[in-house]
Amino acid sequence: MNIRYESCLTERYVQSFINNIAFPKSLEELRYFIDEHGCYNVENILFEDETNWTCPKWAKVGDIVFFMHSKTAKATITKLRTCLNSSRCDYSDSEFEEMMSWINRGLELYKRYGGKIFAVGVVAGLPEYFDDQKETIYHWNSPIYCDIVNVVKLRNPIHISKFNSFITVSRQSGITPVFGEEFDKLKCLISKKNTIPEFLRLSISSSLPLSKKQ
């Protein structure tokens, strides 16, 4: 990663967004994650301090990213378990057991993080466009990515029920912009339950960009 973000110890104006991480939508995609990634997207954020991740095209260096595990993931997990059981004869014993183990692991992740903001990070590079995204089977379709660093896991993740009265998490996109009073309230909510990192404590929400649409 070509990191271009330098932290500072003074208050700064930022934009921010929630990155809502979903679950693989099909058995084919689940198989792809097993073979090519070795972990779920949520685990990638949990285990790494920096990453290259989807972002809005208006993201700037220093902006704040709130990582959330999709509330709807449980329904997807249940559907995949049903599909796997119904197509049992299509898999060898070892492959079936491996895929079922992954589904069960996904359910455990959901029980702990589902519908919750569980980590926060900082945009470290300008958005970049990858036009080969259409060739993949990923459950997300955004071709825009940026480097994200200083990923901090929250000791006490924040459930959507605590902030959906003032933030409407997008159902059409994995990205939900968070600005102005929304940012202030979410930051306050997180800080009541967690020791927040310095970069979040010193962040002040900037004005709304030209469009809230990614």
Explain the meaning of each model-derived region.
Residues 1-61, 66-101, 165-166, 178, ...:
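Compositionally biased, charged N-terminal/linker segments
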Residues 83, 88-188:
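Aromatic- and Lys/Arg-enriched surface recognition patch
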